[in-house]
UniProtKB/Swiss-Prot annotation:
Protein name (record): dITP/XTP pyrophosphatase
GO molecular function annotation: dITP diphosphatase activity; ITP diphosphatase activity; metal ion binding; nucleotide binding; ribonucleoside triphosphate phosphatase activity; XTP diphosphatase activity
GO cellular component: cytosol
Positions contributing to substrate binding: T10, R11, N12, K13, G14, K15, S73, F153, G154, Y155, D156, K176, H181, R182
Self-association state and partner proteins as the record states: Homodimer.
Family: Belongs to the HAM1 NTPase family.
Cofactor annotation comment: Binds 1 Mg(2+) ion per subunit.
One record GO biological process: nucleotide metabolic process
Entry EC no(s): 3.6.1.66
This protein's UniProt keywords: Hydrolase, Magnesium, Metal-binding, Nucleotide metabolism, Nucleotide-binding
Length: 232
């Protein structure tokens, strides 16, 4: 099978390298937005992580004409009705720092006994015509009353993962990757990537035929996991 090109919808080289490590043994060329010129910013106004991830993946795929993978993630706290949720990065305001977001979270949970929380990550892999595959994963934990650890970012210093007895900010990158929400979603993608590549090649063939470009691959619109892809 010929190599496919997959664009990671980020300019964060660390994130693109992390994703690329999961796919390095497959016939796919992983690129990110640094390999291309400027593209429009995505307005993340979706009501769910899935909607926002799909918007980012689809815009990137349509602008570049290549399959694109995007993620959206955040923290959901049970006692706060799932907040900060999709607003995790801007919980304390549009340009809030991690420290400000953490301070607001601690204030919101002041005196609250139920501190159960979970991180959620949704990956969306879209092709230019609209269909996409979606992967979702969670990591359950609790919110501490004070930060611990100097690694990580975001809410990592407050998120305690009981099986490890550590916050995410106390873990090494390798430790965190094995148990985190993003790591679990990427592992799910990795396990199915042979079938995902077949789906991508079939979709490419379909789109080439629509444009009148010859291609010798079979055309199919089936999701390799047995369910219909998400449509725009």
């Amino acid at each position: 099978m010929e190599h496919a090109i997959l664009v990671i919808a980020t300019r964060n080289k660390g994130k693109s390298r992390e994703i690329g490590k999961y796919l390095e043994h497959f016939p796919v060329e992983v690129r990110d937005l640094n390999d291309f010129g400027p593209i429009p910013e995505v307005v993340e106004d979706g009501a769910t992580f899935e909607e926002n991830a799909y918007k980012k993946a689809l815009l990137t795929a349509r602008v570049l004409g290549l399959p694109a993978l995007a993620d959206d993630s955040g923290l959901e706290v049970a006692a706060l009705g799932g907040a900060p949720g999709i607003h995790s990065a801007r919980y304390a305001g549009p340009d809030a720092s991690d420290a400000a977001n953490n301070e607001k979270l601690l204030a919101a949970l002041s005196g609250v006994e139920d501190r159960a929380a979970r991180f959620c990550c949704v990956l969306s892999l879209a092709v230019p015509s609209g269909p996409a595959l979606t992967y979702e994963a969670f990591c359950e934990g609790t919110i501490l009353t004070a930060p611990r650890g100097d690694n990580g970012f975001g809410y990592d210093p407050l998120f305690h993962y009981a099986p490890a007895g550590k916050t995410f900010a106390e873990m090494s990158l390798d430790e965190k990757a094995k148990v985190s929400h993003r790591g679990r979603a990427l592992l799910e993608l990795q396990r199915e990537f042979d079938q995902v590549l077949k789906w991508l090649h079939a979709r490419t063939a379909d789109e080439n035929l629509r444009r009148g470009v010859g291609h010798d691959m079979c055309v199919t619109g089936e999701d390799p996991r047995g369910t219909e892809p998400k449509m725009e």
